[in-house]
């Protein structure tokens, strides 16, 4: 089968890009002929020449409207298709559960950093939802995201839930019985108590993790794997809270799973509505204790095998970290 895949180029290789790359690799391994194209690329493809069209990321509504509905499968990885601000998080620092539309989105959009782009998305929202509603299938990564699409007027009958494939980690864990890696981790540190893996942006909640560390009964170290615009502020906050010597910022690493295998506890302190939570799912599959806020798709990603605490509750997070590190 000939398949056309739309994947908008990004400067950051995040969860969407990783998911799409793995999906394309699986399709090719199954013998399909796959062509990947950016919806803004000069390289134009005629969808009619393909048996199926798969959309992983395409912010151009005009392109979506031209795709053949009977052939198109649309993967909804995050809030962007239904939230003009893209994060389902208001400028008033509140998670948003509203259905998209002129109201209340017209209130939010002008307060965004990229307000012009946000306003354009507000006025294109109705067209985008209509285009999505015509496609033969919509695929989401969690029941939580399915509920968000239904709240925005899309038919539940068209929506399929497909959690991310973890590259054999589930089978590996099942075979060994505990999910721990057999190869020694290749790390630049000797011991990891607490581990955070992800972008250093506000919604990922590292600032709440640092606050929780300052309340823990037993001092622990934290290794941070990842980069982002919050890094300077987080380093300053660690010093301000007296944690400077116990927090290591390790930057981007190519082997995050090795870090997870070596960690006493993997922490996912996101306070925005994570569509799923790939880091949490991978850590659980590797047999690592996980502590996370119970928000968005994180409870599903953890599969009942993590310690979940109320979103934003720093005291509860500190206690959960103490409990999970006890005896270490």
Regions found by a protein language model. Give the residues of each.
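Short acidic/histidine- and often glycine-rich active-site loop of Leloir-type glycosyltransferases
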Residues: 280, 295-308
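Donor nucleotide-sugar binding/catalytic pocket of nucleotide-sugar-dependent glycosyltransferases
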Residues: 106-171
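Short His-centered aromatic/hydrophobic patch
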Residues: 55-60, 76-79
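Acidic donor-binding loop of glycosyltransferase active sites
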Residues: 261-275, 288
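Conserved acidic donor-binding segment of nucleotide-sugar-dependent glycosyltransferases
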Residues: 304-314, 321-327
């Amino acid at each position: 089968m000939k398949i056309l895949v739309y994947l908008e180029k990004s400067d950051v290789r995040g969860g969407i890009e990783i998911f799409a790359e793995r999906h394309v690799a699986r399709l090719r391994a199954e013998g399909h002929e796959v062509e990947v194209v950016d919806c803004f690329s000069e390289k134009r493809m005629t969808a009619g020449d393909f048996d199926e069209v798969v959309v992983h990321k395409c912010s151009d509504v005009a392109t979506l409207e031209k795709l053949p509905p009977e052939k198109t499968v649309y993967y909804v990885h995050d809030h962007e298709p239904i939230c003009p601000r893209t994060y389902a998080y208001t400028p008033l620092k509140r998670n948003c559960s509203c259905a998209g539309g002129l109201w209340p989105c017209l209130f939010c959009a002008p307060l965004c950093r990229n307000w012009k782009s946000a306003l354009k998305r507000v006025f294109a929202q109705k067209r985008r939802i209509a285009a999505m509603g015509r496609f033969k299938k919509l695929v989401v990564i969690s029941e939580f995201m399915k509920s968000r699409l239904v709240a925005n007027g899309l038919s539940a009958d068209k929506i399929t839930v497909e959690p991310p494939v973890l590259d054999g980690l589930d089978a590996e864990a099942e075979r060994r019985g505990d999910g721990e890696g057999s190869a020694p981790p290749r790390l630049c540190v000797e011991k990891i108590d607490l581990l955070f893996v992800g972008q250093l942006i506000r919604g990922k909640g590292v600032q709440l993790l640092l606050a929780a560390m300052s309340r823990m009964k037993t001092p622990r170290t934290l290794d941070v794997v990842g980069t982002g615009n919050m890094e300077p502020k987080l380093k300053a906050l660690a010093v301000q809270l007296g944690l400077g010597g116990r927090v290591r910022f390790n930057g981007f690493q190519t082997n995050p799973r090795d870090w997870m295998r070596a960690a006493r506890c993997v922490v996912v302190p996101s306070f925005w509505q994570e569509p799923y939570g790939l880091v949490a799912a991978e850590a659980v599959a590797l047999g690592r204790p996980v502590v996370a806020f119970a928000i968005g798709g994180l409870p599903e990603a953890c599969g009942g095998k993590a310690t979940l605490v109320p979103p934003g509750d720093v005291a509860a997070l500190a206690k959960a970290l103490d409990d999970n590190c006890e005896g270490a």
